Amino acid sequence: NLMQFETLIMKVAGRSGVWYYGSYGCFCGAGGQGRPQDASDRCCFVHDCCYGKVNGCDPKKDFYTYSEENGAIVCGGDDPCKKEICECDKDAAICFRDNKDTYDNKYWFFPAKNCQEESEPC
């Protein structure tokens, strides 16, 4: 669920997902349209696409199971749908970590009017 996603971002990227990515670019936060503005925004685009492929559970509300092994997040549990959600969240958190140096404050609270281009397909 979204609180677990926040926790994973804190653990993996070392920063608050809500603060840094809650309203960033064209895809971080609620909704998403247009073109990703930078690598961090692309992390959110890919995460949105990942959630869009999940069937049979609710990525924003359902709890999943994960553990930490040697500093890595390992998604677990018996429910394959919830495990998919975990993998989406884990991959996004890793993406945020790997692209921290591209984060640009000019995309924080980026106006939606700047996100009118046609979206690329997932």
Swiss-Prot record:
Q: Name one GO cellular component term.
A: extracellular region
Q: Where is the active site?
A: 47, 89
Q: Which GO terms describe its biological process?
A: arachidonate secretion; lipid catabolic process; negative regulation of T cell proliferation; phospholipid metabolic process
Which cysteine residues pair off into disulfide bonds?
Answer: 26-115, 28-44, 43-95, 49-122, 50-88, 57-81, 75-86
- Catalytic activity, as annotated: a 1,2-diacyl-sn-glycero-3-phosphocholine + H2O = a 1-acyl-sn-glycero-3-phosphocholine + a fatty acid + H(+)
Write down the SUPFAM superfamilies for this protein, in alphabetical order. Phospholipase A2, PLA2
Protein location? Secreted
- Which EC number applies? 3.1.1.4
Q: How is the cofactor bound?
A: Binds 1 Ca(2+) ion.
Required cofactor(s): Ca(2+)
Task: Classify the main location.
Answer: secreted
One Pfam assignment: Phospholip_A2_1
Q: What class of enzyme is it?
A: hydrolase
Per its database record, what is this protein's job? Answer: Snake venom phospholipase A2 (PLA2) that has high lipolytic activity. PLA2 catalyzes the calcium-dependent hydrolysis of the 2-acyl groups in 3-sn-phosphoglycerides.
Q: Do you know which PANTHER family this protein is assigned to?
A: PHOSPHOLIPASE A2 FAMILY MEMBER, PHOSPHOLIPASE A2, MEMBRANE ASSOCIATED
**Name of protein:** Acidic phospholipase A2 3
Q: Which organism is it from?
A: Craspedocephalus gramineus (Bamboo pit viper)
